[in-house]
Amino acid sequence: GSATGTLRVITRDGRIEGGEAPAPARLNVLDGSGHPAVPSSGYAQFEGQNGRVFFYSPGVVELSVPAGPVLVGAVRGLDTPEVSETVEVRAGEVTEVEILLESVWDPKSAGFLSGDHHFHLNYGGPFGLDPEDLPLMMRGENLDVATPLLANLHTRFEDQKLWGWEKADGLPLIRFGQEVRSHFLGHVALLDTRTLFWPWIWGPGYQVYGSDDRPNSDPLGHARSQGGIGGYVHPVRDADPFSPENVASPPALLVVD
């Protein structure tokens, strides 16, 4: 096999102790042949839109990689442009690279928190995540608030046992929400409710509740009655919602609600 060396990646953020302290980040590492490299432990992910394999670093991480050139890409949320560095890893040695990430804007200094209100902790696949896995990911994305949504996968009601779990002991903050799917009427997210809405799904083609006839105002009203927030998720199909092909893509009840 190929000779290998150890790559140590240190990421820093100019907003954290002036860039002196290591900062969590999302990393994408490619060896000289273009193959992704990941740590020996932890959770690696595949991002299908751009074809990247990535993982989250707490600020300092080591990887075993083939000797030779290695490309390291690092980013920390939407307000931090990606920084890429190519380093020459020597066989049998530890090669260190430091990456300083500079933000284009500091939301906290302007009085804002960053958040992600539509994602699912588990949604099929062989690897199950626990809520405790989220803080590292959130810090790597510079996220302050997250509301992972419970949702169905066909007739499976994913992560229902986690309803009520929350992290409220300081940033990042995490509380579970719910995605309700009413087929062509549009999917809605319910945030900060005290009870789950039932049913989670209905409408033509679903394996259960296929003949139910109810508007999305029912789950939205459920959220409002409990002091929560309801809204439509992914109301358009892609990044160009105003293209002629997407004229008919908004869900049927979006405008009505």
Predicted regions and their residues:
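Catalytic cores of extracellular degradative/oxidative enzymes
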Residues: 112-257
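A short, amphipathic beta-strand motif
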Residues: 5-19, 27-29, 70, 99
